[in-house]
Amino acid sequence: MVTIALPKGRLTEEATELFQRSSLISIDISQETRKLVLEDPRGNLRFLMVKPFDVPTYVEYGIADMGIVGKDVLLEVNKKVYELLDLKIGKCFIALAGPKGLREELLKKPEKIIATKFPNITKEYFENVLGEDVQIIKLNGSVELAPILGLSDMIVDIVESGRTLRENGLEVYEKLYDISARLIINRASLKLKREIEGIVNCLERMILQ
């Protein structure tokens, strides 16, 4: 049996659809909202429903053989996993954003405060790309509130449609990285479990269609 870690949340439905279209599963994982461990009736695949940032950890330690996770998570955490495929789902981007109309003023500000769920990505971008040292405040949600309430000057966050930013008087200043879901694999599992190659081939064919 191959164990696959899936992220709970926005990627679950798209990942389920991808597995179904690849004829790998017969169950609808996205409808099993309360179960944390799911097995396909055919008995060859087991799914672990975990938080997105925990997916690489389960794969790294071999609890899961494979996982689906956003590139944002892989950029933020340094885990020893093999990134095998860009699954072309869950597309969005990481952006530097702030109050509408203040872009030039805030980018020129000498001592910037940035709120984000991605402190490592933010630090790497400002230090290595812009050559700046900034104060970073780590938040776990509702990052858009930070500049509105004066906690930060700007934010670094995931943007899909940009609607949440617009509704809160914010706008994108810079696009940092394009993001999509990736298939990651435990290195030992890749060598030991022959079934993995078949799963990967099925997913790869579906992506290329």
From Swiss-Prot:
InterPro entries, per the entry: ATP_PRibTrfase_cat (IPR013820), ATP_PRibTrfase_CS (IPR018198), ATP_PRibTrfase_HisG (IPR001348), ATP_PRibTrfase_HisG_short (IPR024893)
Q: What does the record give as its pathway?
A: Amino-acid biosynthesis; L-histidine biosynthesis; L-histidine from 5-phospho-alpha-D-ribose 1-diphosphate: step 1/9
Q: Which reaction does it catalyse?
A: 1-(5-phospho-beta-D-ribosyl)-ATP + diphosphate = 5-phospho-alpha-D-ribose 1-diphosphate + ATP
Q: Which GO terms describe its biological process?
A: L-histidine biosynthetic process
Amino-acid biosynthesis keyword on record: yes
Q: Which GO terms describe its cellular component?
A: cytoplasm
Q: Where in the cell is it found?
A: Cytoplasm
Alphabetical UniProt keywords = Amino-acid biosynthesis, ATP-binding, Cytoplasm, Glycosyltransferase, Histidine biosynthesis, Nucleotide-binding, Transferase
User: What Gene3D superfamilies has UniProt attached to this entry?
Assistant: Periplasmic binding protein-like II
UniProt cross-references to Pfam families, sorted A to Z: HisG
Q: What is its EC number?
A: 2.4.2.17
A molecular function annotated in GO for this UniProt entry is:
ATP phosphoribosyltransferase activity
* Domain statement: Lacks the C-terminal regulatory region which is replaced by HisZ.
What the record says about family reads: Belongs to the ATP phosphoribosyltransferase family. Short subfamily.
Task: Name the PANTHER family on file.
Answer: ATP PHOSPHORIBOSYLTRANSFERASE (PTHR21403:SF8), ATP PHOSPHORIBOSYLTRANSFERASE ATP-PRTASE (PTHR21403)
Q: What does this protein do?
A: Catalyzes the condensation of ATP and 5-phosphoribose 1-diphosphate to form N'-(5'-phosphoribosyl)-ATP (PR-ATP). Has a crucial role in the pathway because the rate of histidine biosynthesis seems to be controlled primarily by regulation of HisG enzymatic activity.
Tell me, how does this one assemble?
Heteromultimer composed of HisG and HisZ subunits.
This chain's protein is named ATP phosphoribosyltransferase
Query: Which species is listed as the source?
Result: Caldicellulosiruptor saccharolyticus (strain ATCC 43494 / DSM 8903 / Tp8T 6331)
- Please state the gene responsible for encoding this protein: hisG
